[in-house]
Amino acid sequence: MVAKPPVMSFHFAQDLWPEQNIKDSFQKVTLRRYGKCEYENLQLRKGCKHVDECTGHKGGHNTVNQCLTATPSKIFQCNKYVKVFDKFSNSNRYKRRHTGNKHFKCKECSKSFCVLSQLTQHRRIHTRVNSYKCEECGKAFNWFSTLTKHKRIHTGEKPYKCEECGKAFNQSSQLTRHKIIHTEEKPNKCEECGKAFKQASHLTIHKIIHTGEKPYKYEECGKVFSQSSHLTTQKILHTGENLYKCKECGKAFNLFSNLTNHKRIHAGEKPYKCKECGRAFNISSNLNKQEKIHTGGKLNKCEECDKAFNRSLKLTAHKKILMEEKPYKCEECGKVFNQFSTLTRHKIIHTGEKPYKCKECGKAFNQSSNLTEHKKIHTAEKSYKCEECGKAFNQHSNLINHRKIYSGEKPYKCEECGKAFNRSSTLTRHKKIHTGEKPYKCEECDRAFSQSSNLTEHKKIHTGEKPYKCEECGKAFNRFSTLTKHKRIHTGEKPYKCEECGKAFNQSYQLTRHKIVHTKEKLNKCEEFGKAFKQSSHRTIHKIIHTGEKPYKCEEHGKVFNQSSNLTTQKIIHTGENLYKFEEHGKAFNLFSNITNHKIIYTGEKPHKCEECGKAYNRFSNLTIHKRIHTGEKPYQCAECGKAFNCSSTLNRHKIIHTGEKPYKCKECGKAFNLSSTLTAHKKIHTGEKPYKCEECGKAFNQSSNLTTHKKIHTSEKPYKCEECGKSFNQFSSLNIHKIIHTGEKPYKCGDYGRAFNLSSNLTTHKKIHTGEKPYKCEYGKT
């Protein structure tokens, strides 16, 4: 018995295709359902020419449905493509997609849709009706299908499996996207620039680059986005909510994609492999970066200057710089920007708004990326490890920057002076040296900075905020980086090693400074006198000698300094706090440099040797001063009397002769001194402390300098020779005193009678005649 043949519904909007095409097109689809029917048994009848002729259709939606249900089969054809539908509504919907007609418009935002169901779904964005709630985590959704997909996160269910490689996915769309990897097919081509994409959605996103359209706005912060997914991500960042937790280590993430990437660290999974070199990666973006290394990575070329970029967005930004197009203006200060995102970030400077708050410590940030970085301080997780040296980092970007130390790669070059950098951010900072731009101003003291981070750190001076505390000794710091460096004092860690001599340092800048010792290179020249320095910082300090500028003032007693480090040292002297303890004999010091110097004295180590005479020193600074004896160089000149000195400390001591200032007072006896070191030495008279002992004869001294002088008695060493008469001395100060005999110079003058002396000690003794002071008492009572 032959089955009853299918009959076409009388109600359809399209004309039937020619009869000769039935066998080729229609039969294939229809016979899936009616397999037993022969081609000749299919009876097709032509009904109304247009849907408007159908009385059932005019009767309303329900009448049409009844009519369609009554027919044995409901098959409708699309004119553009041979496609078969079992519902009249599906045929109409499909036709609208080809024509591009969008009759259904949203009253809220004017967005149009070609299908009513799409408009209905879209409306829920405005109404925020989240009817479907997840029982596992409480998260609500406005579509049931989204809830179903979400549940798979908790269950781990992945029903969609790739037949090619066996990889499974929790959504069919992910499987479809994945399959394209195997085919390498890129059917979706951009008509504007010719770039091809594997997915149509990627092409849609790409097109926005050309149009610049950003239809998705976040009402909370006013930020606009080109993609709805970016808006969703932004909302999550504002809430700070971390819903996705790693079962392996307990770390939580605000995005599921971040959790997926994180899991690969534990599993060691690296699914993204480079075909060029075979290197594998756990994140697709890292593979993209690697591929660009092989290709030269700069596919987007500027037609104006031939400069190439590895990202089209960078090319767009570059073009605006050439055109000097800056359409986004700040209404507050009038500054213009070539990107809207840059303007948005800039506005926060004026408002002081910090919407991103850390739940752990309450600290707030003006950018979500800063909050993300800050959170890692609390977790202390360092997932990214350097294969070269084993050092671990909490951010992948930090690891990439760290690797450049070994490769020596510096891809970012300054067009102004040619200097190259390994980070684009460092180049951006460097450029401000040429422009002199300092857009970040302190409201407290009007001081301006070229970087916002510098302003943030500066503000802590006014507030006194020190959020980073050392668990070892309790000392607090206003910067996390300073705390990290401080911790190395306790651990003794010295990660920066010199390849030339093997010497290790606890800070990178110390290693950089040290390397210059081997090269003997002096690139930084003083324009005033032509003197050259190995370090630019030394040249900067040297310049202050010529200008006499002292911008750093101590509020305690008004003393001014030419270096911030000197002011810091001064403050510590005022507090009298001794944080650094020498474990060998328990002595404490107020400065880390003092304990370091003390250790060298204790061990007797003298690593810095003079090539001229072979004399060795425990400090490099002492060697530098010593070398001036051979060269006769005296760069520090007194503005008052013109006398020159070979070290700044001697000049500072000399200046006090003219001012008569004695700011350092002994609490025990009230005696005042012009130098803090003299006060320290004086205090030992009261305590009787003599920590510096001679190994030769056992004699003890209250000052290390006295011990050094004493040792020369045993060695009979007299390295300081008078050029006038040939007499030798064991101390440089003794040679200076001796020289006065030849010059007849008497720089120390009595203010009472005008009598002059060649030694300050003689002037001090003379003054006691006027004051009647007799500080030295005989045990038997006579003074």
Swiss-Prot record:
Keyword Metal-binding: yes
Gene Ontology molecular functions: DNA binding; zinc ion binding
Gene responsible for this protein: ZNF107
GO CC terms in record: nucleus
UniProt cross-link Glycyl lysine isopeptide (Lys-Gly) (interchain with G-Cter in SUMO2), position: 186
SUPFAM superfamilies for this protein: beta-beta-alpha zinc fingers (SSF57667)
Record organism: Homo sapiens
Record-level GO BP terms: regulation of transcription by RNA polymerase II
Name of the featured protein: Zinc finger protein 107
Tissues showing expression: Expressed in brain, heart, skeletal muscle, kidney and pancreas. Weakly expressed in aorta, liver and lung.
Family to which the UniProt record says this protein belongs: Belongs to the krueppel C2H2-type zinc-finger protein family.
Its job: May be involved in transcriptional regulation.
Chief place of localization: nucleus
